[in-house]
């Protein structure tokens, strides 16, 4: 939260704000759908609620705080829908901790407004959506299905991968639902498919792919198979990294006794969701694998870090639910309470966890490498306490002041002295003709803006 006040906009943040101003909000939505992308919710948010669209650069810090608040709300709603009151608070805190401790890219997915609102906000919304589905399945109340339908319309317009994953979840629910109770799920699935179709049918999608000179879309069987193979390898490699350091495995092992107690008195919603551990594990793994496929089919590239943030969120939720499902299955099979972990195992794990969190793997023993960790939280503290975030913030503010103070139409700016890993996503370049530089220049009412070579006097 502290670093939110050191965050600064980049690329699309300026681009959306500058493009929407001359057209107006309503006209820009139609233009964006026709010429750039069909993600109607994201288009609306990035122009309607973007502080830069109103010239309010000084309020950019609100974005990461709002997205974090949405993530907390989503986690709380999901835990409240599945657990009894005494367990909701601890479960929410645990879920958020496990997500944030290995968050793939805070810079691109949280502190960059465009990435956060297009992707992480959809993940937070998906948690609320899952909570609504759990309540609808339990109560059968029309109000819950209506609320789920309204949120479905919103989420289908955020980004295509999140939308496709949610459609997959609905299809699985539809297939598993009882024949006499299938109608509401059928309506919800049809609504999701219709909204996804509207987003995918946007002419702007083709224009965008052409503008970035994307490779030809996967159209032949061997190209599709190659994309599937690459996605499978990339997903497997990501899973290896997420599990390989042991943080998630050790944390889950410490939770097994608590899961055993929950399994003795589960809520109906949790019992219904986890009654088939093998199927739940397969679906959770399938969703993660499937999430890597679209970018390989479209542009033959892995998912960008901002999308991997959402995939990791899906993975952690699926992992915890699957772990609980297997523990509950074992408790039912043994027909007795689960034995607690031996004291020496608990103590060893509790002693190891802080060491694993603090390590930076600085094998070269360099001063610059201190605190540069794969653990997101440790890296964030490093950027904050080392002063890098403050220096980055001061340099960005000095740029804004210089641009506002000069009447010159063409301005060269000094390079940033530091690029903290937690905050820095992208910067303008030395080439003033690139679109990022042009969007930056338009925001400050300049003709051209560029970054000067290091050592150049302003």
Residue ranges and their predicted role:
Residues 1-37, 41, 53-90, 180-182, ...:
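Intrinsically disordered, polar/acidic, low-complexity terminal segments
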Residues 3-62, 113, 160-307:
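Transmembrane catalytic cores of multi-pass membrane glycosyltransferases
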Residues 70-82, 125-137, 154, 167-175, ...:
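Transmembrane alpha-helical segments
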Residues 90-134, 159, 290-324:
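Membrane-interface micro-motifs in multi-pass membrane enzymes
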Residues 96-104, 152-157, 191-201, 284-295, ...:
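Aromatic-anchored segments of alpha-helical transmembrane domains
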Residues 135-154, 182-187:
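Short hydrophobic alpha-helices at membrane interfaces in multi-pass membrane enzymes
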Residues 143-171:
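Membrane-interface alpha helices of multi-pass inner-membrane proteins
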Residues 268-283, 289-379, 391:
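Long, charge-rich C-terminal accessory regions
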């Amino acid at each position: 939260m502290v670093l939110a006040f050191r965050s600064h906009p980049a690329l699309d943040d300026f681009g959306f704000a500058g493009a929407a101003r001359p057209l107006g909000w309503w006209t820009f939505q139609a233009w964006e759908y026709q010429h750039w992308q069909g993600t109607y919710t994201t288009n609306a948010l990035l122009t309607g609620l973007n502080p830069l669209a109103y010239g309010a650069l000084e309020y950019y810090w609100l974005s990461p705080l709002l997205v974090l608040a949405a993530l907390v709300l989503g986690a709380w709603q999901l835990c409240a829908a599945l657990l009894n009151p005494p367990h909701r608070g601890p479960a929410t805190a645990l879920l958020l901790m496990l997500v944030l401790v290995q968050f793939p890219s805070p810079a691109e997915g949280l502190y960059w407004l465009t990435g956060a609102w297009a992707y992480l906000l959809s993940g937070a919304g998906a948690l609320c959506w899952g909570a609504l589905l759990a309540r609808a399945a339990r109560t059968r109340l029309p109000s819950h299905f209506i609320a789920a339908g309204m949120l479905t319309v919103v989420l289908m317009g955020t980004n295509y991968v999140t939308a496709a994953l949610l459609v997959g979840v609905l299809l699985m629910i539809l297939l598993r639902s009882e024949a006499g109770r299938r109608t509401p799920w059928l309506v919800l699935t049809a609504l999701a498919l219709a909204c996804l179709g509207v987003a995918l049918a946007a002419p702007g999608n083709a224009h965008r792919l052409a503008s970035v000179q994307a490779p030809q879309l996967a159209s032949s069987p061997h190209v599709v198979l190659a994309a599937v193979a690459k996605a499978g390898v990339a997903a497997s490699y990501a899973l290896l990294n997420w599990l390989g350091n042991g943080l998630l495995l050790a944390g889950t092992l410490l939770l097994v006794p608590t899961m055993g107690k929950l399994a003795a008195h589960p809520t109906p919603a949790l019992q219904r969701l986890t009654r088939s551990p093998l199927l739940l594990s397969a679906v959770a793994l399938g969703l993660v694998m499937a999430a890597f496929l679209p970018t390989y089919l479209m542009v033959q590239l892995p998912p960008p870090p901002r999308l991997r943030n959402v995939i990791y969120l899906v993975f952690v939720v699926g992992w915890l639910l699957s772990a609980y499902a297997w523990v509950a299955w074992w408790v039912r099979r043994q027909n007795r309470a689960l034995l607690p972990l031996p004291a020496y195992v608990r103590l060893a794990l509790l002693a190891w966890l802080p060491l694993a969190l603090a390590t930076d793997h600085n094998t070269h023993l360099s001063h610059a490498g201190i605190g540069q960790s794969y653990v997101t939280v440790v890296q964030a503290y490093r950027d904050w306490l080392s002063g890098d975030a403050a220096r980055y913030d001061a340099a960005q503010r000095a740029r804004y002041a210089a641009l506002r103070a000069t009447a010159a139409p063409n301005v060269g700016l000094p390079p940033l002295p530091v690029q903290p890993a937690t905050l820095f996503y992208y910067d303008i370049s030395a080439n003033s003709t690139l679109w990022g530089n042009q969007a930056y220049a338009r925001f400050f009412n300049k003709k051209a803006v560029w970054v000067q070579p290091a050592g150049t006097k302003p």
